[in-house]
């Protein structure tokens, strides 16, 4: 119940707890990832909310691995940004520029500059890259429609404007790979978009060269 209240998967405190949970599988309990548990009834209720499921996994992993710093869409979820369901299949972690650990399986590692790693924050018990870096990292690498979902939700969360986002990205990340893509998304960002579906529809309209609707 405590884990569910925190929107997290449960991490057993000891081997005895783990064995007790395993005995309740699969009727009552499921394992979204090794070592992480959730009540089947709760998990099934969230079938149409993959973002909440993904956030539960991220928070569970943060309990398992308190030294991990989450990045990209995993960090976006922790920050409360909206993310397209198409982006939620993997776990994204930050690594420094000298580390030689590679992505593998369901883990994607993102090289993050040391100055940004120094700015990592803890949100809801999860260590994550900063809000601005997280949004920029998503905007420069995701498909344009999914990137706009993140950009719109950032402006919705902060109450800022597209002009502010363009100016801030130029000032903070000039010269960074992918800045052109991020700026192209930022110019069309609008915090008045109510949800990800609306953002993706607007992205399709922009891509077709049609007049962008006034929100």
Descriptions of predicted regions:
Residues 1-178, 214:
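Short gly/ser-rich loop at a beta-strand->alpha-helix junction or flexible surface loop bordering the NTP-binding
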Residues 158, 175-178, 193-199, 206:
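Hydrophobic alpha-helical segments and helix-packing faces
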Residues 203, 209-215:
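A short acidic/basic microdomain associated with nuclease active sites
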Residues 62-65, 185-200:
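A short, highly charged nucleic-acid-interacting micro-segment common to nuclease
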Residues 142, 192, 208:
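Residue-level signal for short amphipathic helical patches enriched in basic/charged
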Residues 178-185:
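Helix-loop-beta segment of a Rossmann-like dinucleotide-binding subdomain
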């Amino acid at each position: 119940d405590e884990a569910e209240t925190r929107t997290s998967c449960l991490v057993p405190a000891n081997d005895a707890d783990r064995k007790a949970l395993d005995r309740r599988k699969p009727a009552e309990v499921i394992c979204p990832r090794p070592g992480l548990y959730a009540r089947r009834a709760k998990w099934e209720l969230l079938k149409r909310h993959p973002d909440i499921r993904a956030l539960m996994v991220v928070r569970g992993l943060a309990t398992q691995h308190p030294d991990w710093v989450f990045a990209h869409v995993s960090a976006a979820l922790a920050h409360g940004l909206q993310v397209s369901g198409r982006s939620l299949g993997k776990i994204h972690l930050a690594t420094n520029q000298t580390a030689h650990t590679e992505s593998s399986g369901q883990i994607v590692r993102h090289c993050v500059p040391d100055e940004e790693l120094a700015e990592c924050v803890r949100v809801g018990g999860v260590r994550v890259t900063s809000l601005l870096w997280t949004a920029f990292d998503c905007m420069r690498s995701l498909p344009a429609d999914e990137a706009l979902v993140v950009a719109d939700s950032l402006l919705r969360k902060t109450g800022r404007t597209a002009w502010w986002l363009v100016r801030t990205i130029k000032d903070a990340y000039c010269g960074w790979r992918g800045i052109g893509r991020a700026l192209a998304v930022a110019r069309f960002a609008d915090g008045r978009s109510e949800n990800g579906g609306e953002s993706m529809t607007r992205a399709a309209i922009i891509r077709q060269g049609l007049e962008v609707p006034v929100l």
